Each structure stands twice: as structure tokens, then as C-alpha cells.
Design a protein with these regions (language model features):
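Specific alpha-helical transmembrane segments that line the substrate/conduction pathway
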Residues: 49-60, 85, 93-126, 164, ...
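Membrane-interface helix termini and inter-helical loops of multi-pass transporters
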Residues: 34-46, 97, 143-156, 200-218, ...
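Glycine-/small-residue-enriched transmembrane alpha-helix faces in small-molecule transporters
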Residues: 1-52, 83, 90-91, 140, ...
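Hydrophobic transmembrane alpha-helices of multi-pass small-molecule transport proteins
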Residues: 62, 85, 127-147, 164, ...
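Hydrophobic/small/kink-forming positions within alpha-helical transmembrane segments
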Residues: 30, 34, 56, 63, ...
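Specific transmembrane alpha-helical segments of multi-pass solute transporters/efflux pumps
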Residues: 28, 69-109, 116-117, 137-144, ...
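Hydrophobic alpha-helical transmembrane segments of multi-pass integral membrane proteins
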Residues: 17-20, 48-64, 131-137, 156, ...
Length: 297
């Protein structure tokens, strides 16, 4: 049995395949945000337990998928990637206890963009003029989307969300290296899960779970995190760091639209205009061939 990403790769043209993998991954990221909001903001589970269940369930799901599709030796352990995955999950969960959703999105994705753009620039990646214009439109649309409900975050919450964004940016940059995305992601989850469990033990006095909270955490881990990250790793092999950074700006408007559909939040013209700016800007970035400093690629 072949892994989903490998089977998909055999029957679809490369450009279409990358676009499809990226789009599905962004939907998974947005769904993950919705699940996290449902679980944490409603007090259905404590942040440490949510993070632990998310990583453990993701590790179990990915172990099953990796074992079913194993065709090559396991890749070497990538402890830095596993550590970044743990830092992202832990900081993200705890930040949303004190930071509003709109403010958190701006801090998180701002940190991701700066981290991945810095990595891309250091590696010699550059955009053509239309690519920079598209990125500016997408970033401006994101600020426009979240600014109406922007609330001053607590220093602790802002620091945690910034750390989550930096960790996710580093994790994504490292994700461009693996040849086997399923095995690499499974290994990262497997090594990050004990770190999350250790944190839960250290914070045992805050332990609080409900059946609904457990279900939401498992869905977040096994589906929108575990399998979603496999698709993201598969797409990352064909994206520059700067393109990968830009495309993630599409997650906030997708999540906002999901909140309208599934959380009964009211649609607004601001949401429609911001979403158009973000998605149009991302499309411009993806349509522009990235180049290396001093020459094209």
C-alpha cells in the first residue's frame, strides 16, 4: 500500500499536484485552528493535555500510515524538527488561553513570515516585482482582516505566540529537506510526543479534560495536524522558503470563513475584501517564479 502523497504523485501533473497538496494543507491548518478554539476557549480541556493528545494521536496515526506504506529505510532522526514541533504545539495552546483569536493570528503568522523570509533571503531567494506586490497585498489583507478585533495582548501571551510562529517557521524550513514526508513527519511526532507528555506531568495540577475536549484534541492531532503536516511536507519539497511563507497567509481567511460556516459567526464585507486581497496576493506570489540572488532559477 502506497502512502497517499505518493499515490497522488503518480497520477497528477507536478504543478497541479503541488497546488493541490498546498491547498489541502492550508485547509488542514485552518481546521486545526477551529478545533483548537473550540477546545480551549470553551474550557473543554487544559492546554497541556490538548497539546499532549494532539501529538500522541498524531504520532499513532502517522505510525500506522508509515508502516502501511513503508518502502525504504526510516530517515535519520531529526531532533531539531521534533523540538520545534513541540515548541509550536505547546506555545500555540497556551497562548490562546490569554490572546484573542484575531490578535493571535496576526502575531503567529507575522512571526512565521519573518522567520521563513529570513531563511529564504539568507539562502539567496528573491521575488520578482510582481511577487513582492502580491506578498504585500496578502500581508495587507491579513492586517485588514484582524485589525478590527485587535486587542492588546498580554506580554506572556504575545511572547508565547511569537515563539510558536518562529518554531513553526523553522519546522517548515526544515521540512523542505526530507525525501519521505510520511516517515519524516511520523518521526517528528513520535519524538515530540514524550516532550508534551512530560510537560503535562509537570503541570498535572492544571489537569482538566472532558469527552468533547478529548475528541477535539484527537481530531486535531490525527487528522488536521498529522495527515495535514504530511501533505505540507510533501508540498514543501517543491516550494521556496519565501513562497511557503507567503502561501500560509491564506490560513487566517480560510479559518475565518470556517468560523462563519461552522461556528455561526456572521459574515462581513471586511472578511470578503480581506480574503480576496490575501488569496489574490498569494496567487500572484505562486504565479511568479522565485529566483536566486544574482540570477534566475
Amino acid at each position: 500500500m502506497r502512502p497517499l502523497a505518493s499515490t497522488f504523485a503518480l497520477h497528477v501533473r507536478p504543478g497541479v499536484r503541488v497546488a493541490a497538496l498546498t491547498s489541502i494543507a492550508m485547509l488542514a491548518f485552518a481546521s486545526n485552528s477551529l478545533l483548537c478554539r473550540l477546545a480551549l476557549q470553551a474550557g473543554r480541556i487544559d492546554a497541556a493535555s490538548f497539546g499532549s493528545l494532539r501529538l500522541v494521536s498524531g504520532a499513532l496515526m502517522l505510525a500506522i500510515v508509515a508502516r502501511a506504506g513503508a518502502r525504504r529505510p526510516a530517515p535519520p532522526a531529526d531532533w531539531p524538527a521534533a523540538a520545534m514541533l513541540f515548541v509550536y504545539v505547546a506555545c500555540f495552546s497556551f497562548a490562546y488561553l490569554t490572546v484573542s483569536a484575531a490578535t493571535g493570528a496576526l502575531i503567529l503568522f507575522g512571526a512565521v513570515q519573518l522567520t521563513m523570509f529570513a531563511a529564504g533571503w539568507r539562502a539567496g531567494e528573491r521575488f520578482a516585482a510582481i511577487g513582492w506586490a502580491g506578498f504585500g497585498a496578502a500581508l495587507g489583507g491579513l492586517v485588514y482582516l484582524v485589525s478590527p478585533g485587535l486587542a492588546a495582548p498580554t506580554p506572556r501571551g504575545a511572547a508565547l505566540m511569537t515563539a510558536a510562529g518562529i518554531a513553526w517557521g523553522i519546522y517548515s524550513v526544515r521540512g523542505r529537506r526530507p525525501v519521505d514526508p510520511v516517515a519524516a513527519t511520523a518521526g517528528n511526532f513520535l519524538r515530540a510526543a514524550p516532550l508534551a507528555l512530560a510537560l503535562s506531568v509537570a503541570l498535572a495540577t492544571r489537569f482538566h479534560v472532558t469527552p468533547a475536549g478529548v475528541v477535539l484534541a484527537v481530531l486535531s492531532g490525527a487528522l488536521t495536524s498529522g495527515l495535514g503536516y504530511v501533505l505540507w511536507y510533501a508540498a514543501l519539497r517543491h516550494l521556496t522558503a519565501m513562497r511557503a511563507a507567503a502561501v500560509q497567509l491564506s490560513v487566517p481567511p480560510i479559518a475565518a470563513c470556517g468560523a462563519v460556516l461552522f461556528l455561526s459567526e456572521q459574515p462581513t464585507w471586511r472578511l470578503a475584501l480581506a480574503s480576496a486581497a490575501i488569496l489574490g496576493g498569494v496567487a500572484a506570489v505562486l504565479a511568479t517564479r522565485a529566483r536566486q540572488a544574482g540570477g534566475s532559477r
